[in-house]
């Protein structure tokens, strides 16, 4: 940038001492130093902002590349699953045609899903309804809390009774 050596700085200082005078030179030097510091901070902020924008643009490019790769993988998986499903259906269709179709325990090819089995098993959805359905003797036997206390209330309840502490000033 600007090539300032020791000799050039000494020359600038001597000229400033003659022009400005020895009384105002320290104040002017402080002001110039503060302005140079501000300029350096501003330049550093601009550099940091530019580098952040460049990194952000690179991250955006990486994100789009990653999303494209994920879409390609998803398409490939769906394609393979569809092909395997079709092959399985064709194989099952061929097996049904050769079996004669007189099987009573086949169930019509219905396979229940996990969700249907889960709903049939649980029945109730609400946690409160499930908890309320249990009898009180069962809750007592299995240590299910019926009456919940806060931590502070529990500490107060179980803290041993002590006599009041005396003040330092009494």
Swiss-Prot record:
Database matches in InterPro entries: TatA/B/E, TatB
Cell compartments where the protein resides: Cell inner membrane
Superkingdom of origin organism: Bacteria
GO CC annotation: TAT protein transport complex
Keywords, comma-separated and alphabetical: Cell inner membrane, Cell membrane, Membrane, Protein transport, Translocation, Transmembrane, Transmembrane helix, Transport
GO BP term, example: protein transport by the Tat complex
Annotated GO MF terms: protein transmembrane transporter activity
Primary localisation category: membrane
Protein topology in the membrane: Single-pass membrane protein
Binding partners and assembly: The Tat system comprises two distinct complexes: a TatABC complex, containing multiple copies of TatA, TatB and TatC subunits, and a separate TatA complex, containing only TatA subunits. Substrates initially bind to the TatABC complex, which probably triggers association of the separate TatA complex to form the active translocon.
Function: Part of the twin-arginine translocation (Tat) system that transports large folded proteins containing a characteristic twin-arginine motif in their signal peptide across membranes. Together with TatC, TatB is part of a receptor directly interacting with Tat signal peptides. TatB may form an oligomeric binding site that transiently accommodates folded Tat precursor proteins before their translocation.
NCBIfam families: tatB
Name of the protein described by the UniProt record: Sec-independent protein translocase protein TatB
Organism annotation: Cupriavidus necator (strain ATCC 17699 / DSM 428 / KCTC 22496 / NCIMB 10442 / H16 / Stanier 337)
């Amino acid at each position: 940038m600007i090539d300032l050596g020791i000799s050039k700085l000494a020359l600038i200082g001597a000229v400033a001492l003659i022009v400005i005078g020895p009384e105002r030179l320290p104040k002017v030097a402080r002001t110039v130093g503060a302005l140079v510091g501000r300029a350096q901070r501003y330049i550093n902020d601009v550099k940091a902002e530019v580098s952040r924008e460049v990194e952000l643009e690179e991250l955006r490019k990486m994100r789009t590349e990653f999303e494209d790769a994920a879409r390609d993988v998803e398409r490939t998986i769906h394609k393979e699953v569809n092909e395997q499903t079709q092959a399985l259906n064709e194989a099952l269709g061929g097996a049904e045609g050769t079996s004669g179709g007189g099987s009573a325990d086949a169930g019509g090819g219905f396979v229940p899903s996990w969700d249907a089995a889960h709903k049939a098993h649980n029945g109730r959805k609400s946690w409160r309804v499930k908890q309320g359905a249990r009898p009180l003797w069962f809750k007592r036997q299995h240590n299910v809390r019926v009456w919940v206390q806060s931590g502070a209330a529990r500490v107060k309840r179980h803290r041993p009774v002590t006599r009041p502490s005396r003040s330092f000033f009494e």
